[in-house]
Amino acid sequence: MSKLLLILALAVLAQCALVAGDKPKDNFIRLG
């Protein structure tokens, strides 16, 4: 259970890091 949440968190953080210099707000909207 914890592993799934950890993987999801890492994926989100990785994507945020990749799009940090582009448009993080749009990225969050897409995820949400």
Swiss-Prot record:
GO terms for cellular component: extracellular region. Keywords: Amidation, Secreted, Signal, Toxin. It is found in: Secreted. One of its GO terms (molecular function) is toxin activity. The modification Leucine amide is found at L31. It comes from the Eukaryota. Residues 1-21 form the signal peptide. Expressed by the venom secretory cell of the spine. The spine is a cuticular structure containing a single large nucleated venom-secreting cell at its base. It is an independent unit capable of producing, storing and injecting venom. On the back of A.stimulea caterpillars, spines are grouped together by 50 to 100 to form scoli, of which there are eight. Belongs to the FARP (FMRFamide related peptide) family. Negative results: has no effect on human neuropeptide FF receptor 1 (NPFFR1), NPFFR2 and kisspeptin receptor 1 (KISS1R). Has no effect on ASIC1a and ASIC1b channels. Is toxic when injected into Drosophila melanogaster. Also shows a low anthelmintic activity against the parasitic nematode H.contortus (drug susceptible Kirby isolate). This is U-limacoditoxin(13)-As2.
